[in-house]
Amino acid sequence: MGAPMNPEFQLEGRAPGSLAGARIVVAMSGGVDSSVVAALAAASGAETIGVTLQLYDHGAAVGRTGSCCAGQDIRDARAVADRLGIAHYVFDYESRFRDSVIADFADEYAAGRTPIPCVRCNQGVKFTDLFGIARDLGADCLATGHYVRRVVGAGGRAELHRAADPARDQSYFLFATTRDQLDYLRFPLGAMPKPRVREIAAELGLGVAAKPDSQDICFVPDGDYASIVKRLRPEAAEEGEIVGLDGRVLGRHRGLIHFTVGQRRGIEIGGSPEPLYVVRLEPETKRLVVGPRRALAVSAAMLDDVNWIGEGYEGPLTAKVRSLAKPVPARFEDGAVRFDQPEYGVAPGQAAVLYAGDRVLGGGWIRATVPAELAVAA
């Protein structure tokens, strides 16, 4: 059974369903999602080329699967390409990935912020370097396995929308995608539930049909991100004081890299009449400031490096400050997100992404927060 036709590959200037002579480059990670995208592209009638970036290979080192773009993943991608009868190329981007993603990850933690390396990777390696490769190969578009939707708006420009399957939506991680990139990108899985994607892979006899999903941070073995940061920025692992909101020393911590704003676990301080949470990190003094939950309330988040793809929109919007958080009503004014109601656990280094319904309007990196005026005892 062949792969179904997918309208996502429609190209401007071509009649619907007419892709003869077109060329599509597919970003293939070796997982089931990108493999099905390659199958859908091949079924469209366009010449399809699979491209895999060798980014980081710790899979062999930790003896398990689930690490993105590792050696086994490259072999899986090549096997899928062979079965589909499409060309497949591998490019070594380990050095670039190390410098632009891993080093930035360590720097952010050392500065007391909470980074999102997947956004940095999409922003740089995947949607900049991979774009260059696709254009050099003469592709009419670049297709990926992200669960988001590309919708052509009333003005004829592409918009970024949430995936149809909310449990799989990855729009938060793609807020930095530019207008020009959206014009070139295709996301064939945005309207599909994940079980259907696996069904297509099984129907086509792809060996990755039952392959587990990759972990979120591909270069962090077993989720121990602190060991990565400690190796690259050892000063971030130095012990320091735990202090209350009034500056009173309450105890010692084993390194700021083990904490993020809003965290409760691991503080290990007894005698407090109410639970204590991380309110902020002060890397200059190595102090961990803790307080009650109400001390986490913020009224606004100041953003850096804002990417806005909501030109012309002036209606109500919502903001999302963590990948798994629910969007909340907010306003966007002068580079700041101002929440209608106090928001909790907003960490510098994270992203604030703005939505109008399902449409992504843009977002930016949280530089600082403005405390809500709630009564907080010292």
From Swiss-Prot:
Keywords associated with the record: ATP-binding, Cytoplasm, Disulfide bond, Nucleotide-binding, RNA-binding, Transferase, tRNA processing, tRNA-binding
This protein's record includes keyword Transport: no
Entry protein name: tRNA-specific 2-thiouridylase MnmA
Localization per Swiss-Prot or TrEMBL: Cytoplasm
Residue span of region Interaction with tRNA: 168-170
Disulfide bridge map: 121-218
Marked site: Interaction with tRNA: 146, 350
Sites where the protein binds ATP: 27-34, 53, 145
GO biological process, one term: tRNA wobble position uridine thiolation
Species, as recorded: Rhizorhabdus wittichii (strain DSM 6014 / CCUG 31198 / JCM 15750 / NBRC 105917 / EY 4224 / RW1)
Function comment: Catalyzes the 2-thiolation of uridine at the wobble position (U34) of tRNA, leading to the formation of s(2)U34.
GO MF term set: ATP binding; tRNA binding; tRNA-uridine 2-sulfurtransferase activity
Classification via InterPro entries: MnmA-like (IPR004506), MnmA-like_C (IPR046885), MnmA-like_central (IPR046884), MnmA-like_central_sf (IPR023382), Rossmann-like_a/b/a_fold (IPR014729)
Active site: 121, 218
EC number: 2.8.1.13
Chain coiled-coil ranges: none
Keyword Cytoplasm on entry: yes
Pfam families reported for this sequence: tRNA_Me_trans (PF03054), tRNA_Me_trans_C (PF20258), tRNA_Me_trans_M (PF20259)
Broad enzyme group: transferase
Reactions catalysed: S-sulfanyl-L-cysteinyl-[protein] + uridine(34) in tRNA + AH2 + ATP = 2-thiouridine(34) in tRNA + L-cysteinyl-[protein] + A + AMP + diphosphate + H(+)
CC annotations in GO: cytoplasm
Similarity remark: Belongs to the MnmA/TRMU family.
